[in-house]
Regions:
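Helix N-cap / beta->alpha transition motif
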Residues: 18-19, 47, 62-65
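C-terminal structural segments of small proteins and small subunits
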Residues: 66-79
């Protein structure tokens, strides 16, 4: 729930964040087109919302989906760190 609240503050309460902003903020290493290809191929498990059925329609990510994706990535990182036998306690929020 904390991630969702942080995102709500970051995006001024927008329900759907434009894909270019999500790409700029969280996928800086990718272009918007490359991010779309990764989503369509299943490499990135992030639902893309289209405002209409048209291919040219505005695309975005629902804020709850982005929060869930970020939380899943954080959990995967914690799991990987634990498997590597990292020293120290892993903090969870």
């Amino acid at each position: 729930m904390k991630t969702l609240m942080i995102l709500m503050a970051q995006y001024d309460g927008l329900a759907v964040i434009p894909l270019d902003r999500v790409c700029r903020d969280y996928f800086r290493h990718l272009t918007v087109d490359k991010l779309l290809r990764k989503v369509m191929s299943g490499e990135v498990a992030l639902p893309i919302t289209r405002m209409e059925a048209s291919q040219k329609a505005a695309k975005g990510v629902h804020i709850a989906d982005l929060a869930a994706y970020l939380d899943q990535q954080a959990e995967a990182a914690r799991h990987e760190c634990a498997q590597l036998g990292s020293v120290g306690e892993i903090r969870t929020a």
